[in-house]
Amino acid sequence: MKLGLITQVRDEIDIIRAFCSHADALFDRVYVVDHQSVDGTGKYLKSIIAGKPGWRYFFLDSKTKIQTAVGNFVMKQAFDDGVDALFFLDADEFLLAPSRKALEDSVKGLPGDECAGSITWKNCIREEFEPPVFSFNDPLWVPPLESKFAKLVVP
């Protein structure tokens, strides 16, 4: 099964390293759309994506809010590349999947190829906001309930 991820980012230097590591462990294809980052996010992404054949970087040189159109364009690219299931995450969103196999099993549990599925998550917050760069070792406040919102998964 080939899993893909689309993420749209802007000025995420504080969390992008952890997010890319997380994405690399779970996804075969990663499509990153950079919405004019000026904090070093774009430079970092270009440097790591150069060594990852399954990753693509897009720079959106426009100040308009066209996330839906961009997402649709990149989604077509992903399915043209043979992705079996496609996730949409922001750079500050991490899937609670103990392994790649567990994530694949979740996808296999979706209703079918003609119907999109969804996943839920918990909105965690760092207990301390220093240092400015996020690490998986940072203590987090984890709420008892999942968010009332869901993330889309397209098979």
Predicted stretch roles:
Residues 43-88, 99:
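Active-site-proximal specificity loops/subdomain of glycosyltransferases
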